[in-house]
Amino acid sequence: ILEDASVMSFFYLNDDESLFYLHTHPTEDRPTVVFINALIGQTEMWEGYIGKTLRAHGFGTLSYNFRGQVETRFDPLKELSPNLIVDDLIKLLQATTPKRPVLVGLSIGGLFAAQAIQNGVQAAGLVLINTLRKPGLRLDWINESTHRAFKAGGRDLLLDLMAPML
């Protein structure tokens, strides 16, 4: 079920769970760019310069937050697994029917986008940003630093450190 409000839109997965999303249709014969967050991401990362620039050139945009991210409702007892996140993305795309979607995934969002395509989503394109890094000492350091930064300064510090240009 979709509910549109003047400021926010929600896709209801069931009575107790919903995803926050923002969807603007293209104004020309252009695709819709669908943004898939990193685990620490949210719609506001995409809706600033990137989203405004795309919309100014006639592209549609669709950004949303995973369960557990800002403005979503979710069952805290439910395991937020990658499969669940991909299933939610597929359901949201089926409900919103974006025109010629181009999936753009940041970090693990790129993996979720690719898995959605593997599971039948018809996409006009796929863009991966900083996705699927090789495991090793550098990635271990990044993961540990991310955890420590979140403990020290919360989500805002993490966004400043990990996605300052978005």
Residue ranges and their predicted role:
Residues 17-74:
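Conserved HGGG/HGGXW glycine-rich cap/lid loop of the alpha/beta-hydrolase fold
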Residues 158-166:
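Histidine/lysine/aspartate-rich catalytic loop segments that bind and position anionic ligands
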Residues 2-19:
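N-terminal cap/lid segment of alpha/beta-hydrolase-fold proteins
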Residues 111-118, 122-153:
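Flexible "cap/lid" loop of the alpha/beta hydrolase fold
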Residues 37, 101, 105-107:
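Conserved alpha/beta-hydrolase "nucleophile elbow" surrounding the catalytic nucleophile
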Residues 48, 60-102:
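Active-site loop/oxyanion-hole signature of alpha/beta-hydrolase fold enzymes
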Residues 62-64, 106, 129:
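The conserved SAM/SAH-binding core of class I Rossmann-like methyltransferase domains
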